[in-house]
UniProtKB/Swiss-Prot annotation:
NCBIfam families, per the entry: rplX_bact (TIGR01079)
SMART domains: KOW
Underlying gene: rplX
Record text on subunit structure and interactions: Part of the 50S ribosomal subunit.
UniProt name for this protein: Large ribosomal subunit protein uL24
GO molecular function, one term: rRNA binding
Organism lineage: Bacteria, Bacillati, Cyanobacteriota, Cyanophyceae, Synechococcales
PANTHER family noted in UniProt: MITOCHONDRIAL RIBOSOMAL PROTEIN L24
Function per UniProt: One of two assembly initiator proteins, it binds directly to the 5'-end of the 23S rRNA, where it nucleates assembly of the 50S subunit.
Pfam families in the record: KOW, ribosomal_L24
Position of the signal peptide: none
């Protein structure tokens, strides 16, 4: 099994249908029910970073003389299986399906609402 610092093996990777800028809802873990925008995806690790979710506190030492140390709150990554795409219009989380248009282009569509994302 892959750790957070190593890359997932090709057999362990999941299809990430979530992209940067999407709104997602956390469906498992300590932040269950929270929604936020995806800031970054890490497809090699099956993880993503969501704005305002899974916050971690990091302590920084002073780097120069006369400077004081700081406490920084930042988002930690979540596993992609712990989030679902979220419809802001209908206020509901949904699975996503890939729809092939007549011109051959692929679009992402929410299954519950029918909302097309791309």
């Amino acid at each position: 099994m892959a750790t957070a610092t190593s890359k997932a093996k090709p057999s362990d990777r999941i299809k990430m249908r979530i992209r940067k800028g999407d709104t997602v809802q956390v469906i498992a873990g300590k932040d269950k029910g929270k929604t936020g925008e995806v800031l970054r995806t890490l497809p090699n690790e099956n993880r993503l970073i969501v704005e305002g979710v899974n916050m971690r506190t990091r302590h920084e030492k002073p780097t120069q003389e006369g400077e004081t140390g700081r406490i920084v709150n930042e988002e930690a990554s979540l596993h992609a299986s712990n989030v679902m795409l979220y419809s802001t219009a209908k206020k509901v989380a949904s699975r996503v399906e890939i729809v092939v248009e007549k011109d051959g282009s692929k679009k992402r569509k929410l299954k519950k609402t029918g909302e097309v994302l791309d």
